[in-house]
């Protein structure tokens, strides 16, 4: 049986279109807020509102899938995100955008959970790794293309919203031509997310997802603002964000192979150390292109390696619940990161963005170094 079946290919095709829309908005919303003369802390709170929506969407989607299945859940998630896009044009203001970014965050998280769970249920223990790799590649390619779009098209609010909303609705079309079955859902209902979060042997993986959320949430939410305050144009900001994301794309396969060959603990240690080096390089303002590249290559691949670490510690029937727990952990980190970092930037300096990233990475590195590497034999492979 082929790994990349027709339902899988159509699902990933729809995800690509949705990711394009998500990437464009994630880059431009902080800039639109800055153009409305909102303070840095307000920009951070709006970013956190989006990630709060992610948190709510992650918690709700399991129930939604159980009630209406993968296909209808996917349609619903896409419509919710489209509403969050279109709503930004109704009224420009802090409270209005706080609400609509929350709605968009709910829809976005629902899309992620539906797609990830559908891929898990479509695969087997032998091919889930390839499915997850394909998912991450599509996600980052979509994000990369979205950043390039920002550098090539008009970034005016009312110019962007119509085609971004259209892209979101177009992402529904591939799933109209196939049906993703939920054959294994009943087998996963008995495993709770809470029990996965409390699993001692998977704690480094869970902590890694939290740290990854803090790092990537801060980069996505506040990096455009950091560059804007440095006098970089909107088009150039799109280019630099594309450099950051392209590094994450290029790093996926080699880092995954290194993790399989040399062990995930060693690779996680090296990744976190490189994130610290990249942050220091950004603070020194020396050679921004190499600094952003190594920061992207290490930071954007931290989540899948940490996720693989945690998933290999659980039984086969616990994989979906563990995946939900890890996404929840990532979302919590994404919620806390931009909000706290934005307050530091507002009160002290924009450089606190990279000081914060380096600090939380150093804390995680200490956790990894405390582990002697004598971990239990893996019981499941994703």
Swiss-Prot record:
Q: List the InterPro entries hit by this protein, alphabetically.
A: MFS, MFS_dom, MFS_trans_sf, MFS_YcaD, MFS_YcaD-like
Q: Does the keyword Ribosomal protein apply?
A: no
User: What GO annotations for molecular function exist for this entry?
Assistant: transmembrane transporter activity
Name one cellular component (GO) term: plasma membrane
Pfam families assigned to the protein according to its UniProt record, in alphabetical order: MFS_1 (PF07690)
The similarity comment for this entry is: Belongs to the major facilitator superfamily. YcaD (TC 2.A.1.26) family.
| NCBIfam families linked to this entry | PRK03633.1
Report what the protein is called: Uncharacterized MFS-type transporter YcaD
Source species of the chain: Escherichia coli O17:K52:H18 (strain UMN026 / ExPEC)
């Amino acid at each position: 049986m082929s790994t990349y079946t027709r339902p899988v290919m159509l699902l990933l095709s729809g995800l690509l279109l949705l990711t394009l829309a998500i990437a464009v908005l994630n880059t431009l919303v902080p800039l639109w807020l800055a153009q409305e003369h909102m303070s840095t802390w307000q920009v951070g709170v709006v970013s956190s509102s989006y990630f709060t929506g992610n948190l709510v969407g992650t918690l709700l989607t399991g129930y939604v899938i159980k009630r209406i299945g993968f296909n209808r859940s996917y349609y619903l998630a896409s419509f919710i995100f489209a509403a969050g896009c279109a709503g930004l044009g109704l009224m420009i203001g802090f409270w209005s955008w706080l609400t609509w970014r929350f709605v968009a965050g709910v829809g976005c998280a629902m899309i992620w959970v539906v797609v990830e769970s559908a891929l898990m249920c479509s695969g087997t223990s032998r091919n889930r790794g390839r499915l997850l790799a394909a998912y991450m590649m599509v996600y980052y390619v979509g994000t990369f293309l979205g950043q390039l779009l920002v550098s090539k098209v008009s970034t005016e609010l009312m110019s962007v919203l119509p085609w971004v909303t259209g892209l979101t609705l177009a992402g529904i079309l591939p799933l109209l031509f196939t049906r993703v079955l939920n054959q294994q859902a009943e087998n996963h209902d008995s495993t709770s997310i809470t029990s996965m979060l409390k699993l001692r042997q998977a704690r480094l993986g869970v902590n890694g997802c939290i740290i990854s959320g803090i790092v990537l949430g801060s980069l996505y939410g506040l990096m455009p603002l950091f560059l804007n305050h440095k006098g970089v144009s909107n088009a150039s900001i799109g280019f630099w964000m594309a450099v950051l994301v392209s590094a994450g794309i290029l790093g996926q396969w080699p880092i995954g192979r290194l993790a399989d060959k040399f062990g995930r603990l060693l690779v996680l240690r090296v990744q976190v150390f490189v994130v610290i080096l990249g942050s220091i390089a950004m603070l020194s303002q020396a050679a921004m292109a190499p600094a952003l590249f190594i920061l992207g290559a290490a930071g954007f691949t931290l989540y899948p390696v940490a996720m693989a670490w945690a998933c290999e510690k659980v039984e086969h029937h616990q994989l979906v619940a563990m995946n939900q727990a890890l996404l929840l952990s990532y979302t919590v980190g994404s919620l806390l990161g931009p909000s706290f970092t934005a307050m530091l930037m507002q009160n002290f300096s924009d450089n606190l963005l990279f000081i914060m990233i380096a600090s939380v990475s150093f804390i995680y590195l200490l956790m990894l170094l405390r582990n002697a590497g004598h971990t239990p034999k893996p019981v499941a492979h994703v």
